[in-house]
């Protein structure tokens, strides 16, 4: 029994110890929570003060701007219902008291703003039109340049009245086509009227003169080559003694004639061939001495 009695109090002591410690811990935790709540409440009070200050500032700003119109009953009820606190309602009432006189100016201001916005809008279109006008002269400038180049081409081609005939259009291919046609027509008319200008290209190319001359009139070459050779053969012994009194001016240039046919293979013959076809075209059966005299004189002019 004694053992049991001893065991009971020993068992009761540890049972009483833990609940006392737990109570003290709970009390400490409650105190901490209360302190935290007090801090939160203090923060909430500060926030409420700040909100009131913000509302007062909003009221002062709205009262200075005077943006409110006459409020109808429905608008009043809507604003009151929409307000979440009494501070908003009080602020609205304060604003209404300050703005007793109804203001119809706000609707006038937006109209003025619209007019101000409409005025700057029309000026931008003129600058849009001006660049288009600036582009037009740019297009005119390149059209003027090809005309100048065509003028130079016409000058090189030998057409004095060509640039005046060219239109001032934008198409540049038309004057080029006219240029291609004009020299061809001139070349076609020249051999029909006078074959003298053919000596120009022959002077530039001295080695292919026979080939070019055969292309123009192959029939005349066979006739006059033999006659010209005979003329030059006769002229060699005749000129040194000076037996020919009628041909005074051709005597000094005649010594230059023999080296040309010897070196280039018929330079003097080619020049003489270019000029004589004028007479055979008009008079097919000319006598031998007549073309010889003309050949000598014209050959001297070409060599000079």
UniProtKB/Swiss-Prot annotation:
Residues 1-27, 66-91, 114-160, 239-304 are annotated as: Disordered. One of its GO terms (biological process) is positive regulation of cell size. It holds the Pfam family DUF4589. Transmembrane segments: none annotated. Residues 120-129, 239-261, 277-289 have a biased composition (Pro residues). InterPro entries: Largen/INSYN1 (IPR027997). It comes from the Eukaryota. Keywords: Coiled coil. Residues 33-70 form a coiled coil. Residues 1-13 have a biased composition (Polar residues). Residues 77-91 have a biased composition (Low complexity). The keyword Coiled coil applies. Regulator of cell size that promotes cell size increase independently of mTOR and Hippo signaling pathways. Acts by stimulating the translation of specific mRNAs, including those encoding proteins affecting mitochondrial functions. Increases mitochondrial mass and respiration. Was named 'Largen' because overexpression causes cells enlargement. This is Protein Largen.
């Amino acid at each position: 029994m004694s053992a049991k009695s001893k065991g009971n109090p020993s068992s009761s002591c540890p049972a009483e110890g833990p609940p006392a410690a737990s109570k003290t811990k709970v009390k400490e935790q409650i105190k901490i929570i209360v302190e935290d709540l007090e801090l939160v409440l203090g923060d909430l009070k500060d926030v409420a003060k700040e909100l009131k200050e913000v509302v007062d500032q909003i009221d002062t700003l709205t009262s200075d701007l005077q943006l409110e119109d006459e409020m109808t009953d429905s608008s009043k009820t809507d604003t009151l219902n929409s307000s979440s606190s009494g501070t908003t309602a009080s602020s609205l009432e304060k604003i209404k008291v300050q703005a007793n006189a109804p203001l119809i100016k706000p609707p006038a201001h937006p109209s003025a703003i619209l007019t101000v916005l409409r005025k700057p809008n029309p000026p931008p279109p003129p600058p849009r039109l001006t660049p288009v006008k600036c582009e037009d002269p740019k297009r005119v400038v390149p059209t003027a340049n090809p005309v100048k180049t065509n003028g130079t081409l016409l000058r090189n081609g030998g057409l004095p009245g060509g640039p005046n005939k060219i239109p001032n259009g934008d198409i540049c291919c038309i004057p080029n086509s006219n240029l291609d046609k004009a020299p061809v027509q001139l070349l076609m008319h020249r051999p029909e009227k006078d074959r003298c200008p053919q000596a120009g290209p022959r002077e530039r190319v001295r080695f292919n003169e026979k080939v070019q001359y055969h292309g123009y009139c192959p029939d005349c070459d066979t006739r006059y080559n033999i006659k010209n050779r005979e003329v030059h053969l006769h002229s060699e012994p005749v000129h040194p003694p000076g037996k020919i009194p009628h041909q005074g001016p051709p005597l000094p240039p005649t010594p230059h004639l023999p080296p040309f046919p010897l070196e280039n293979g018929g330079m003097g013959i080619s020049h003489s061939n270019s000029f004589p076809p004028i007479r055979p075209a008009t008079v097919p059966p000319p006598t031998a001495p007549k073309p010889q005299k003309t050949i000598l004189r014209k050959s001297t002019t070409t060599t000079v």
